[in-house]
């Protein structure tokens, strides 16, 4: 049951399984990219705050890093490396 026990038997099992996966990722702590500590928590939709270095950043709605953001960051890093050569 876990985090979706608050819904009881309502909404169906498959929907509760999807919500469970989302809520677990939403409420978990993430590693801060600035200080490296596991203190990044979600404050609101897309707003993430580090309790250690007190930085507030914009991220994904349910996870700190979205897959598209990771793709863009790696492309930018690759282009910078090509520019430096």
UniProtKB/Swiss-Prot annotation:
KW Zinc-finger (keyword) present: yes
Gene (name only): rpl37a
Complexes and interactors: Component of the large ribosomal subunit.
One Gene Ontology MF term: zinc ion binding
Zinc finger (C4-type): 32-53
One Pfam family per UniProt: Ribosomal_L37ae
SUPFAM superfamilies tied to this protein: Zn-binding ribosomal proteins
Protein task: Component of the large ribosomal subunit. The ribosome is a large ribonucleoprotein complex responsible for the synthesis of proteins in the cell.
Cited NCBIfam families: eL43_euk_arch
A cellular component term, taken from the record's GO annotations: cytosolic large ribosomal subunit
Keywords: Cytoplasm, Metal-binding, Ribonucleoprotein, Ribosomal protein, Zinc, Zinc-finger
Cell compartments where the protein resides: Cytoplasm
Family to which the UniProt record says this protein belongs: Belongs to the eukaryotic ribosomal protein eL43 family.
Identification of the protein by name: Large ribosomal subunit protein eL43
């Amino acid at each position: 049951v876990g985090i979706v026990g608050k819904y009881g038997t309502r909404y169906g099992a498959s929907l509760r399984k999807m919500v469970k996966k989302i809520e677990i990722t939403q409420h978990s702590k993430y590693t801060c990219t600035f200080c490296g500590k596991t203190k990044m928590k979600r404050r609101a939709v897309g707003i993430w705050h580090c309790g250690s270095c007190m930085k507030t950043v914009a991220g994904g709605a349910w996870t700190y890093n979205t897959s598209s953001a990771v793709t863009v960051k790696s492309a930018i890093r690759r282009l910078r490396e090509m520019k430096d050569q």
